[in-house]
Amino acid sequence: MLLIKRARIVEAASEKIPALRESIGKYKEKNHILVYCGATTVRDYGYQEGVPTSEEIRQIDAVTDLLGNQMGFRVAQFTSKEDALTRSKLIKSFDQGEMIQALIAIRCLDEGVNIPSIDKAFILASSTNPKEYIQRRGRVLRLYPGKNYAQIYDFITLPIPLDKVKGYATEDISGFKGLAKRELIRMMDFAKIAQNPYEIDTLIRDIKNAYDIEDEELERESEEEWDD
């Protein structure tokens, strides 16, 4: 069961790349874009600050190829490989928006990097830890001249597509509900402060119905996440 669950999650996560293509296309002429990659979080076993995993490297390279080569964005990677001077130059160029439209990064929102000019963020590195994703969100929402709001696309991972959930036995679905609940909690938290919560309300309702998740379950799960 654990192997199946892992395979489902990996497969679902890989679908974030085509979803990114669909979402980011309308910003082809815009600047100050961050694409935040990553397969692990600071709570994961084996996490080392400044040392990306092979999965993270594969994702950031895939995103770089998509945006830079296939879609024609002016991009740069922002990872632990760059020294402090290089990072400073990248941020300056990103702020100016002439040479770099988009930074494709690993972990920078978790490791103290401050780039307040970001006003469009595509977060592929989902976290179910509220303290972690609130910190990431807060870094994107930093004040900057001419920046009145930020647009955040937070990509969720569901182990089973909504249109296929009903084809699974109840006992199989129960093994996947934990992830679905944690993703729902993050979605609901984002919706609370969004200017367009109505765009996510329907999806939240559909996920609840498909996975048979009650509001009381989400409340308990949320309290447990904050207590960890």
Q: What kind of feature is each model-predicted range?
A:
Residues 1-73:
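Interdomain linker/hinge connecting the two RecA-like lobes of the SF2 helicase core
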Residues 41-58, 162-180:
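Short, flexible/disordered intra-domain loops and linkers
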Residues 101-106, 110-127, 132-139, 149-155:
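A short beta-strand element within the Helicase C-terminal
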Residues 34, 55-111:
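Conserved helicase ATPase core of P-loop NTP-dependent helicases/translocases
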Residues 164-228:
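Long, largely alpha-helical accessory region at the distal end of helicase-like NTP-driven motors
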Residues 40-42, 83, 109-110, 126-129, ...:
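Conserved nucleotide-binding/hydrolysis micro-motifs of P-loop NTPases
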Residues 14-17, 102, 130-134, 146-149, ...:
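Amphipathic alpha-helical transducer elements in NTP-driven molecular machines
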Residues 139-175:
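Conserved segment of the helicase C-terminal RecA-like domain
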